[in-house]
């Protein structure tokens, strides 16, 4: 065990010596580390959770355990591990537990460490870490930081352009970068080297399905699981139901389909957006729209005869809203009016609708503008909301219709 931990210390030190892409933090690192609560960094694989945790602790004395290591898991002995940590990391202040969800009964062990006064930073690639798995023993004991692939603004930072303060001579470059991001996404490895995009994301997608879904849940029918994942990534931004998917893909039961859908959400690969309705029963019955965590997966995996820029932009807007803290269980929905007009995103704050967001890549056609504006104003009337936005690729203006003022903004100003 000591050899494993010593090897992991070498791994930690090597990781700390590397240069890293800069991320924008929505939190105060010093305040976070000063808290006695568990610091939990969650998000998809390979978005930089481990890097962020290492950078947070770079100038601190901290111990490190990487649970993506099979030798560590195979020889696991909690008491022995703690003795070896004291030996390898004398006088450590923090313990970094990387991808701790791979350890069986991890929550019980973490709870015990917390009870003993250990200051913990944890990373994990499973959305359910904050629900069923942590609901009992760790409730009220943690602070969460959720990480996603690079935002558009962070992508511009990497390319040394301030998205919020563009100079006239940067407009052409900015348009190229915005289009690049929409098509290829923001995974850190891909941002650093665009030549890697398709091969890297193809492998990553398959790895998530195998490590975080099939292996974790002991899925026997890998073919059906893969077929569902391919169907979802190819039909992103479209409404789906478990019943329809079961029939379309020839699965054995609706329960199996729903179970697989839930499994594919857990590692942050897919999100399912409910249709807004005041009646919870009707909302649960309605189709949900499926979104993928990064547009690059669409380029790498989707079956498509031609790219759909409108759907790519819509997916990008959705992920940006998730990044800002909107929750598909509580605060973000789509909506269909009584006349079947659709709004892409309904944003709720408590009991009130705070904003309606429509996405339209190109509004240069009068027919397209009329369709989008009519949908927005009709739904605004039904939902009693006056804060109306249409997000476009590069259009910016104000439209007034039926007493409503609609802000048309480019994605760069969302």
Please give the residue ranges for each predicted region.
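Accessory nucleic acid-recognition modules appended to NTPase machines
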Residues: 195-353
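A short, basic N-terminal segment
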Residues: 1-35
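Interdomain motor-coupling "hinge/lid" segment immediately C-terminal to the ATP-binding subdomain
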Residues: 2-14, 127, 133-239
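Hydrophobic anchor at the beta1->P-loop junction of P-loop NTPases
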Residues: 41
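Domain-level recognition of nuclease-like catalytic cores that cleave nucleotide substrates
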Residues: 393-414
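Short glycine-rich substrate-engagement loop in P-loop NTPases that contacts/grips substrate
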Residues: 63-93
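Conserved lysine of the Walker
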Residues: 49-50
